[in-house]
Amino acid sequence: MKFCAIFVLFIVLAINGYDCKIVQFIFGDSLSDVGNNKNLPRSLATANLPFYGIDFGNGLPNGRFTNGRTVSDIIGDKIGLPRPVAFLDPSMNEDVILENGVNYASGGGGILNETGGYFIQRFSLWKQIELFQGTQDVVVAKIGKKEADKFFQDARYVVALGSNDFINNYLMPVYSDSWKYNDQTFVDYLMETLESQLKVLHSLGARKLMVFGLGPMGCIPLQRALSLDGNCQNKASNLAKRFNKAATTMLLDLETKLPNASYRFGEAYDLVNDVITNPKKYGFDNSDSPCCSFYRIRPALTCIPASTLCKDRSKYVFWDEYHPTDKANELVANILIKRFDFMRADDGISHAPSPAPDISPSSDNN
């Protein structure tokens, strides 16, 4: 799971008459999506129907893949930051970017372009980076290159994805990656790709960046439902551990090589695993099945109006087959706030801007 420290104290800077804040730019998947896929007309990975959003605002679906808030929402709120707006939100413009930052996260997206292809439309990380480059062009036109460079270099960046590259790619025989690689070579492939992506983000100004690790993927309700005995699938969870270990090493290496880079890895595996293993310790009654399900039909994959809801959503760790409930997200957010020393605006680093490189091409339907 993926999320922490996308949050900073506000420092107001006078930029050509604008009050430019230090903001967040979030890159991720459905755990961080706040409405991008809602605006992708052909996407099969959406949270557009009830009962998604039932405990958020007016109770209507808003694009978040949960009943309430994401972890990013909760941490940002507690630190006092505005929520970054979804890139595809109709309200998006230059002023919104300068005031709130942007969330590019997309349900079904992965580090690899090929991940989640059967969802038809989703933003891979490469695509999200391309969109970010477009955001930069818009801001440069608004406030000028010098001030735009400072704005983007002062911003905070979060990269929180990777589980789809396993669950909706490598672990599915319909994808060629499942038979082209073994466990270690696939993780190596992911690390090579992610390293290239982080280097691109650095060249685009990302100096303060956090990558979040994966949780025990084999213990989400979907993976349990697909197992023979209803227990966690160790293969998937062990892949998450491999990913986390490799990402930690890669980030430490990158930080020493890239000028003025402050890169951190947010490890959450042990925390989430403990919540799932010992739910009552954290106030939950159920950690192995979704609150929103289609009667006894499992896996239901998504929550729909015909689904049935559990009696008390606050007692369930999982909202649907993939995603945590608002209550679980709140627990994780609170523990992460205590665990990590968040990157703040007042520890800024001065640096010279780097030229933007060519972006690796993304597939047409990303």
From Swiss-Prot:
The keyword Secreted applies. It comes from the Eukaryota. One of its GO terms (biological process) is lipid catabolic process. Glycans are attached at residues 113, 260. The active site is at 30 (nucleophile), 320, 323. GO terms for molecular function: hydrolase activity, acting on ester bonds. Belongs to the 'GDSL' lipolytic enzyme family. This is GDSL esterase/lipase At1g74460. It comes from Arabidopsis thaliana (Mouse-ear cress).
